[in-house]
């Protein structure tokens, strides 16, 4: 069990609506559960959504690395731990560790968060210095910072799909989990039945909105290792870059 003055812990029962046909928590719901814990913790630390909104600001995730040791299963109860690790000029790193009730480490993750104004421009974190000092700089789920994915997959012969209602968040942007869903859906069922996700890195580059369309370009760089670029139809700009690593099922 992770413990510290500024850590946050939540428990979650894995119901049938959270799992796939393999009876395992889906990557999208894994992502959403960690994000919800981060949102709730930020609120408890005094720098949550409502507090920032009164100044015309909001939190946005910019990067995330997730190591999946074992995906939580249907009817399992998991313990979700999260904590901020400090901040610099524009970025607050935050870690997550998910465990079974018996203390088995299932998932480790590290993230970068920024504060944006309503025009999508970064805000200096010094504006919120006092609540952001409530952190655990020496506590790490993953010690290295979230990955910067440097290479894009070129846009070629795109087939665009619309951003739909279920993709939108409280800021009327495509929510972070929607990008994970889009990537997971780019692999067919046969692939999912024969592989399990073991690592995901995601870089958010720009926001996507309700009136937009997107497409995914994907390249296998090594066996089971895929790089994906998500492009917006508007000006053909890359909005998200994702790396997934998969292991074959026994």
What is each of the regions a protein language model found here?
Residues 1-61, 108-110, 116-198:
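Hot-dog-fold acyl-thioester-processing enzymes
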Residues 155, 159-244, 249-250:
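Acidic/His-leaning functional-site neighborhoods
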């Amino acid at each position: 069990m992770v413990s510290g003055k500024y850590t946050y812990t939540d428990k979650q029962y894995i119901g049938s609506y959270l799992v796939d046909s393999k009876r395992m928590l889906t990557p999208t719901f894994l992502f959403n559960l960690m994000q919800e814990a981060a949102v709730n913790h930020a609120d408890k630390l005094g720098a949550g959504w409502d507090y920032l909104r009164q100044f015309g600001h909001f939190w946005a995730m910019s990067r995330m690395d997730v190591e999946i040791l074992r995906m939580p299963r249907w009817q399992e109860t998991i313990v979700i731990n999260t904590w901020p690790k400090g901040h610099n000029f524009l970025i607050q790193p935050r870690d997550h560790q998910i465990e079974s009730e018996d203390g088995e480490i299932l998932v480790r993750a590290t993230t970068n968060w920024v504060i944006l104004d309503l025009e999508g421009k970064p805000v200096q974190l010094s504006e919120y210095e006092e609540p952001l000092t409530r952190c655990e700089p020496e506590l790490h789920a993953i010690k290295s910072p979230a990955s910067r994915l440097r290479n894009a997959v070129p846009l070629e012969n795109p087939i665009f799909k619309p951003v739909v209602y279920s993709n939108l968040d409280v800021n009327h942007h495509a929510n972070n989990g929607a990008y994970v869903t889009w990537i997971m859906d780019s692999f067919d069922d046969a692939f999912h039945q024969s592989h399990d996700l073991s690592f995901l890195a995601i870089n958010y580059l720009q926001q996507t909105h309700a009136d937009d369309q997107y497409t995914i370009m994907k390249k296998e760089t090594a066996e089971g290792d895929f790089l994906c670029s998500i492009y917006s139809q508007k000006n053909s700009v890359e909005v998200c870059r994702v790396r997934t690593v998969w292991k074959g099922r026994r």
